[in-house]
């Protein structure tokens, strides 16, 4: 028996995550763009980027933990990096086989915090989120949506690349993880194939029609364009060297735009 549709439906019911994100954008106006990247702390991505895969669930889990926590808890600016480092620890405990040593995390933060501060922040964040770390990230939906799209390696790589470009982008907080995943696949299809109609199969399994994906997809196209000019509001340095190497081999890393459907430009 195929339970995939039931699983996707269950994950989509966890709509509370969009409430966290909207609160975050409304209540934390000082955490915009560059500051948002500082909180995420791009240096801590090195832990995940050692792994040779297209996409890492721990990486997205860390960012979602940060955003959910900041949506409901006031933190002074000097403690923002501590939030990022501690979120890495929590994400690894939940998603990864290998968990970083606290002393190593202190080194990542240039010894700005003590071991006690990291452990106290871990306790605060876990209690604030009520130990609920199971809310879905785009990674949860990506594999299933790619299967529905009958993806090949090229489509898979570029879809994950589109998602990674969005990880540090403040304005993408408003979208549900399922919509980000579906939009990334739709955008990748437009890039690789000029334009291919969003199939009924994809619409059925993702729950989104083409019109519902256009706004999100257009933003992904804009990030793709800006990545090649160095004008990205966040930073592409969080992308793993493995990811960049794979996408470069496709010839699409920073070329995006020429093959897009005119509706996306």
From Swiss-Prot:
Pfam families: Cyclin_C (PF02984), Cyclin_N (PF00134). CDD domains: CYCLIN_AtCycB-like_rpt2. The keyword Cell division applies. The keyword Cell division applies. GO terms for biological process: cell division. Keywords: Cell cycle, Cell division, Cyclin. Transmembrane segments: none annotated. Gene3D superfamilies: Cyclin-like. InterPro entries: Cyclin, Cyclin-like_dom, Cyclin-like_sf, Cyclin_C-dom, Cyclin_N. It comes from the Eukaryota. Belongs to the cyclin family. Cyclin AB subfamily. This is Cyclin-B2-5.
């Amino acid at each position: 028996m195929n339970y995939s549709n039931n699983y996707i439906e269950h994950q989509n019911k966890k709509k509370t995550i969009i409430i966290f994100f909207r609160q975050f954008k409304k209540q934390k106006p000082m955490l915009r763009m560059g500051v948002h990247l500082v909180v995420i702390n791009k240096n801590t991505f090195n832990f995940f980027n050692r792994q040779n895969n297209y996409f890492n669930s721990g990486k997205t889990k860390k960012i979602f933990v940060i955003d959910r926590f900041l949506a409901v808890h006031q933190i002074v600016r000097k403690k923002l990096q501590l939030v990022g480092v501690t979120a890495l620890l929590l994400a690894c405990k939940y998603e990864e086989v290998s968990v970083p040593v606290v002393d190593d995390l202190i080194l990542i933060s240039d010894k700005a915090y003590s071991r006690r501060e990291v452990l106290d922040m871990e306790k605060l964040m876990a209690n604030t989120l009520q130990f609920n770390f199971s809310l879905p990230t785009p990674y949860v939906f990506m594999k299933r949506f790619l299967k529905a799209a009958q993806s090949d390696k090229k489509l898979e790589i570029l879809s994950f690349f589109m998602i990674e470009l969005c990880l540090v982008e403040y304005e993408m907080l408003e979208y549900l993880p399922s919509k980000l995943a579906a939009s990334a696949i739709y955008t990748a299809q437009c890039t690789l194939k000029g334009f291919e109609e969003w199939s009924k199969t994809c619409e059925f399994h993702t729950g989104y029609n083409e019109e519902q994906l256009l706004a999100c997809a257009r933003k992904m196209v804009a990030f793709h364009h800006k990545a090649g000019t160095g004008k990205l509001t966040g930073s592409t340095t969080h992308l793993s060297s493995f990811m960049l190497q794979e996408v470069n081999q496709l010839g699409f890393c920073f070329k995006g735009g020429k093959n897009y459907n005119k509706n996306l430009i």
